[in-house]
Structure formats: C-alpha cells, structure tokens
C-alpha cells in the first residue's frame, strides 16, 4: 500500500514548481518538464520521496524521538500547527527565533518565563496585582505564546526537523545542520536540495499541497505511536 497516490498529488497541485527564471539548477533531477514558464515537478519521484520521508519519520518516532515541525510562511502556518499537534510533536509557525536550537538554554529561559506568567494567571496572582502590571504581563504572555507556544514543552533538542520551504527557513536549517540534526523538507524548484537530508520535491506555495504532505508526515508519527501502544497493550 503506497503512502500517497499520484492522483492526490495532482489534485493538491504538488507538481507546480516556480517560474523557470527562479530555479536552483540542483533541482533539475526532480523536474519533469517546463510549461508556460513554470517548472513541473516529476511526481513519480515525489511519490518515492514521500515514502522515504514517511519511513524516516516513522522510524524516528518509533525510537521515541521528537520531531520539530517548522513552517513560518503564510501557506504553511496552519498546517504546521494542526499536524504537529495531531501527532503530539512540537512546532514553530510564526518566526524562527535565532538560536532556537544552537542556543537552546537561552530559549528555555524564555519558555520558563512563559510558564511563570501562565502560572500567575492561573493561581490568582493577576487578581492582586495592579491593573497596569497585569496588562503588561498579558501582552508579554501573548508574545511569548505566539513565538514559543509550539515548543514550550520541548525538553531538549529534537531528533529531526520537518521543514516547509528550506529557503525561507534557512536559519533553522543552518542550526540543524550545525548540530547534525537530520532534516526532512518540502523542497520547491527554487531551493537547494543539498541542504536537506530527506527531500520531498513539491510545491511549497499551495496551502493544499503543504497540508497534504505535512499530514502524511504526521500520519507516519501516529503509525509509530500506535505500534507502541499495541506493544505495551
């Protein structure tokens, strides 16, 4: 049983690459043809690459590894949050804060601050503080939650990164590479595939395409987790 069908990929517009003038020659091996000034991605290769990425995600999750989903462009934000949450994993879907991986201790301090303010809100501290101070704390909480909410329960570095558009997320990719954290990525015709360990050649600009592929990666994690439940049961 294949993980994904050509029909699903076609319907989601996964085959549409970027304009021919905006391409990375290293993506040539994944390009099928050119049509009306746009590169068309070879979906037979995408099917194979999705299957490889699926197996990789499943294996990492089966070993108890955590995967960090990263996608801050508008077309990816919702899918990244929804699918990472569904799979019980972590995500960054707003802005990648420099040092999220390479300076994780500092990020953990910000996360501690986020949790401290949350606790104050829950335990009634807000009720006894001056109104002005509460307004400031709520603003701070909102900002911290926006940028760190998806990783606030991440205790250590992830075992892998799943990235939508490595060109847009180049800081995240560079940090992961520096720390030898494997990267699985949705890579369009304008990206450098050499930066990514497990390339999924696909349209990274269509919401449906991003949602479809991200959901398959979440499915892989859930399959591994269901396997664990069966074993423990």
Curated annotation (Swiss-Prot):
CDD domains registered for this protein in UniProt: RPS2
Matches recorded under PROSITE patterns: RIBOSOMAL_S2_1, RIBOSOMAL_S2_2
Gene Ontology BP annotations: translation
Record's keyword terms, sorted: Ribonucleoprotein, Ribosomal protein
Cited SUPFAM superfamilies: Ribosomal protein S2
Example of a GO cellular component annotation carried by this entry: cytosolic small ribosomal subunit
GO MF, any single term: structural constituent of ribosome
InterPro entries per record: Ribosomal_uS2 (IPR001865), Ribosomal_uS2_bac/mit/plastid (IPR005706), Ribosomal_uS2_CS (IPR018130), Ribosomal_uS2_flav_dom_sf (IPR023591)
Pfam (any one): Ribosomal_S2
PANTHER family reported for this sequence: 30S RIBOSOMAL PROTEIN S2 PROKARYOTIC AND ORGANELLAR (PTHR12534), SMALL RIBOSOMAL SUBUNIT PROTEIN US2M (PTHR12534:SF0)
Family according to the record: Belongs to the universal ribosomal protein uS2 family.
Protein name as catalogued: Small ribosomal subunit protein uS2
Organism: Bacillus cereus (strain ATCC 14579 / DSM 31 / CCUG 7414 / JCM 2152 / NBRC 15305 / NCIMB 9373 / NCTC 2599 / NRRL B-3711)
Gene that specifies this protein: rpsB
């Amino acid at each position: 049983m294949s993980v994904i069908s050509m029909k699903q990929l076609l319907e989601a517009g996964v085959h549409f690459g970027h304009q021919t003038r905006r391409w990375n020659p290293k993506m040539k091996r994944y390009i099928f043809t050119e049509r009306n000034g746009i590169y068309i991605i070879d979906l037979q290769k995408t099917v194979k690459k999705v299957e490889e990425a699926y197996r990789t995600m499943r294996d990492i999750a089966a070993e108890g590894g955590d995967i960090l989903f990263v996608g801050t462009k508008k077309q990816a934000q919702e899918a990244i949050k929804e699918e990472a949450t569904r799979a019980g994993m972590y995500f960054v879907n707003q802005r990648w804060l420099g040092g999220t991986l390479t300076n994780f201790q500092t990020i953990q301090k910000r996360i501690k601050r986020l949790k401290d303010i949350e606790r104050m809100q829950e335990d009634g501290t807000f009720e006894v503080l001056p109104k002005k101070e509460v307004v400031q704390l709520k603003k701070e909480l909102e900002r911290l939650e926006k940028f760190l909410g998806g990783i606030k329960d991440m205790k250590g570095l992830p075992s892998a990164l799943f990235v939508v558009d490595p060109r847009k997320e180049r800081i995240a990719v560079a940090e992961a590479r520096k720390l030898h954290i494997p990267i699985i990525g949705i890579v369009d015709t304008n990206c450098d595939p050499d930066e990514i360990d497990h390339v999924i050649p696909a349209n990274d600009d269509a919401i449906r395409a991003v949602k479809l592929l991200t959901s398959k990666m979440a499915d892989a994690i859930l399959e591994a987790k269901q396997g664990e439940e069966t074993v423990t049961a």
